[in-house]
Amino acid sequence: MIFAKKTEAAGFKAGVKDYRLTYYTPDYKVKDTDILAAFRVTPQPGVPPEEAAAAVAAESSTGTWTTVWTDGLTSLDRYKGRCYFIETFEGQKDNQFICYIAYPLDLFEEGSVTNLFTSIVGNVFGFKALRAIRLEDLRIPVAYVKTFEGPPHGIQVERDKLNKYGRALLGCTIKPKLGLSAKNYGRAVYEGLRGGLDFTKDDENVNSQPFMRWRDRFLFVAEAIYKSQSETGEVKGHYLNATAGTSEEVLKRAECAKELGVPIVMHDFLTGGFTTNTSLSKYCRESGLLLHIHRAMHAVVDRQKNHGIHFRVLAKTLRLSGGDHLHSGTVVGKLEGDKDVTLGFVDLMRDDYVELDRSRGIYFTQDWASMGGVIPVASGGIHVWHMPALVDIFGDDACLQFGGGTLGHPWGNAPGAVANRVALEACIKIRNQGQNVLREGGNALREATKWSPELAAACEVWKEIKFEFDTIDTI
């Protein structure tokens, strides 16, 4: 009874009230320091858009399902998330809409993608009042961007380290992805690098299995790198996958790579986790190692149009966490990827300043300030006939990665690498002459086959191979 009197005197009124009374504020003026989020929301039948949107703002910031007396011990008006705009669509049977929410910067720990995601995409995705919810985009304010170190090195520093300019980089994932011994694996790496590739790569699930322990792989791959460099006079690299069961083991493997003198390591950032990724990125920056990032598991999170997190958000947060390369899809290969959507998040990975452009799925203008860019990696079901389209789509600041498109060459790995290098150089040549590479690229490849038997064989093998399916995730 005593406590009840004190509570009443303090003006606390227990009970449940609509979220929209507190968290829906259409008159709110967005601040430059706010983190902005665009959610695609599908509410349960009978739930008004304002209430559903306000529930998202509440549950991802200061709110809970009922009024609590400790609300009076802080300033909710300062710390709460606010839904400031709702965008509806005519003719939507499920009442789906886009809600825009502003979060005060004080809600988030500096330099922590882990904390950012825990708040914004935490409990709210299991909220019963919503049938589905998808985070379409985030606006990261410069004030928050500057609390992150970002990519270990960035695009320009990588080019300077490699001494390679004026064209995309060429890579290859070693296949079969599992089952090779370390020595045979090293041989496959050597053949690809000496044939003209800039990089070869561990597949995402190559860690340290009984058939090939990580240290053995690192040693044989380092030997392959040094041998191919001495023969070609070019800087070569292999993405040594440092992903492991613990963060300590990840850093241990990266340290071994540094001691061997190789230029780059790799991490599976979603399965490995953002905390480990940020720690590895810091180590790579201090050690001079480049960091290649694989997005294994991303489609579990981003492929469904109505629920999950769009890849453009994952790409933004990876840039904050740190990585010099990130797989981005190919548009033309075997993996999901709409062209306009892909170009949108490729710009978000590489550019310093990206304007709002809904035609490419970009909901907010993003200013990265001085943070370095991330090289997009096009990988998955691509071969020499795709080269003109890849050069047209991605330009120079990209890594084009041909796994089966190198190792599947009828004459072996090295000729497969030669074919890809010749195809790339042929497309770059006509582009630099002012020709339309998308329209004239096929003719350039046919012309190059007259003096490159390796390219001729590759063109013959893959002339009928296409991956033509409708894209699920469109604007």
Swiss-Prot record:
Mg(2+) binds at residues 201, 203-204. Its cofactor is Mg(2+). The modification N6-carboxylysine is found at residue 201. Keywords: Calvin cycle, Carbon dioxide fixation, Chloroplast, Lyase, Magnesium, Metal-binding, Monooxygenase, Oxidoreductase, Photosynthesis, Plastid. Its EC number is 4.1.1.39. It comes from the Eukaryota. GO terms for cellular component: chloroplast. The basic functional RuBisCO is composed of a large chain homodimer in a 'head-to-tail' conformation. In form I RuBisCO this homodimer is arranged in a barrel-like tetramer with the small subunits forming a tetrameric 'cap' on each end of the 'barrel'. HAMAP family: RuBisCO_L_type1 (MF_01338). Binds 1 Mg(2+) ion per subunit. This is Ribulose bisphosphate carboxylase large chain. InterPro entries: RuBisCO (IPR033966), RuBisCo_large_chain_AS (IPR020878), RuBisCO_lsu_C (IPR000685), RuBisCO_lsu_C_sf (IPR036376), RuBisCO_lsu_fd_N (IPR017443), RuBisCO_lsu_N_sf (IPR036422), RuBisCO_lsuI (IPR020888). Pfam families: RuBisCO_large, RuBisCO_large_N. It is an enzyme of class 4 (lyase). RuBisCO catalyzes two reactions: the carboxylation of D-ribulose 1,5-bisphosphate, the primary event in carbon dioxide fixation, as well as the oxidative fragmentation of the pentose substrate in the photorespiration process. Both reactions occur simultaneously and in competition at the same active site. Substrate binds at residues 123, 173, 177, 295, 327, 379. Belongs to the RuBisCO large chain family. Type I subfamily. GO terms for molecular function: magnesium ion binding; monooxygenase activity; ribulose-bisphosphate carboxylase activity. It comes from Bigelowiella natans (Pedinomonas minutissima). SUPFAM superfamilies: RuBisCo, C-terminal domain, RuBisCO, large subunit, small (N-terminal) domain. The keyword Lyase applies. Coiled coil: none annotated.
